[in-house]
Amino acid sequence: MNKKILFIPLVLFLLLAAALLWQFNRNADGDDPTLLESALVGKPVPVFKLESLQNPGQLYSQKALINGKPLLLNVWATWCPTCRAEHEYLNTLAEKGVRVVGLNYKDNRVKAINWLNTLGNPYALSLYDGDGMLGLDLGVYGAPETFLIDGKGIIRYRHAGDLNAEVWKDEVQPLWNKYSKLAED
């Protein structure tokens, strides 16, 4: 009887070790929440009414995003170190004619304006989402996140994390080219 009681902690330990090992393997092979496709891909941009970042009181709705041509909606904040890392590349894309709309997310308006004045402003339009409601409606995990929106206001792609030259070339640019061509037809 005593021998059986001694084996109970060993069995419990082995079960716990097996569960931990399973969880580590599960996370290592692709259960990364940033890789989840947005539930909004293929659907219109959520209805919103937000102020301009630089001009409080000047309101914009989702209709401001629709002009027949695709755009990138970039969710960013000054408290986000990865946003700083991607900012220079966003400036480069804007210089190449890519329409980028900024969504300043849960941030301090004054700090955000100073950031753009210091680092450059790649945004054709800057929206202020101080309470994060549009971010919530978009299913944003955090900043940065970038959405490709076609000329009709339909979300076609979501990227969580740094939008850099490699991500642009491999993932976003082919879709950008596709929806730009459709806008021309």
UniProtKB/Swiss-Prot annotation:
Protein name: Thiol:disulfide interchange protein DsbE
Cytoplasmic side: 1-4
Cell location: Cell inner membrane
Entry similarity comment: Belongs to the thioredoxin family. DsbE subfamily.
Purpose of the protein: Involved in disulfide bond formation. Catalyzes a late, reductive step in the assembly of periplasmic c-type cytochromes, probably the reduction of disulfide bonds of the apocytochrome c to allow covalent linkage with the heme. Possible subunit of a heme lyase.
Coiled coil segments of this chain: none
Disulphide bridges: C80-C83
Pfam families found in the cross-reference section: Redoxin
InterPro entries hit by this protein: Periplasmic_diS_OxRdtase_DsbE, Redoxin, Thioredoxin-like_sf, Thioredoxin_CS, Thioredoxin_domain, Thioredoxin_ResA/DsbE_sf
